[in-house]
Each structure stands twice: as C-alpha cells, then as structure tokens.
C-alpha cells in the first residue's frame, strides 16, 4: 500500500488521494507509512476503474500487467507465491469508495485457492477443516459476486449439510463436510454458468477485479 504517497503528491491533497485510492486504500496506505503493521497489498485506482468502464469493460493497455507487477511485489514481501502449493499466497479483492459505505461493497476472499493449492495448504497447516472452509468461501463469494449466482443457492447447500450431519451451527461441521460443500458449490457454478470454477489463480484475480470494477 505504499502508493499513497505518490497519490497524494499527484493529486495535491489527502482528499485527492482518497478520491484516487478510495477511503479503504488510502487509509491502509496511511497506516503503512506510519509504521502500523499492515499486511502487504496494493490498490487499483478509481482512474483505472473509470478507464475500464469507459473502454467497454476492457482493461486499458498495461493496467492488468501493472496489477500483476504489484502482485509480484506482494510475493516478494511475503516470501510466498500466488498459485504455489508449497508456499501459497492468498489474496482478497475488495471494492472501495471515497466515503464509507457499510454493507454496499463487494469482497472476494481467499483468491488463489484451487484443488492443488488446497492440498498444499493442508500439508502446511495440518488443518483440512480450515482449508476447505476457506476454499468454499472463495467459491461461494466468487460465484455470487463475480458470476451472479444467487447466494441463497449456496446457503441452501450448507443448511442441507448441517441437517444431514445433525448439527445446528456451521462451526460444528467437519472437514469432510466442507470438502463436500466445496464440491457442490463448484457444481452449482457449472450449472448456472456452463463453465467450471476457474482453477487458475490469475484468472480468479482478473475476474474478481473486473467484477469489483462493475
């Protein structure tokens, strides 16, 4: 989030930086330069969003490449690699605005998970329940936010699994439950879209970015 200084210099004021980076991005950048521990990340500007929308919902020349360059910087800062099962980097894509709009912004968590990365993460954490719960969250959010699948369709699967397992809350579901839920979520995406859930982490990030732009 080191781009906040450049944004402030470019726009000539903190208010201008907030307009360019959004309140969330600007505040994270400000905390970073103050030395507050903030996980590495980057902000895609509102100007990039406007150019995308103005160009017929296509990335302007060089914008996607700049996003990938920023992602490489996060890899360098964390010692992890996007899509690498041995050292997996997971990222979130969040929308933002100049002013706070609780409940109105889109979020896709755990981008970078796929079948291979999930197995690698299980080997690293020895916690398959955590991994498959994280994986199903990605598939559910991606399906809802990016692909337009009604969220209640996913929630119905979780409810049915709780009933079948004889438990009342999600926290009582086992790793095998979340693994099966993830599989069913992928089936839902294929049914609604005619396409499989994307296993390529960079494609996940690109599609998530486009969804947040829209």
Q: Model-predicted segments: where are they?
A:
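Nucleotide/phosphate-binding sheet-loop regions of phosphoryl- and nucleotidyl-transfer enzymes
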Residues: 1-214
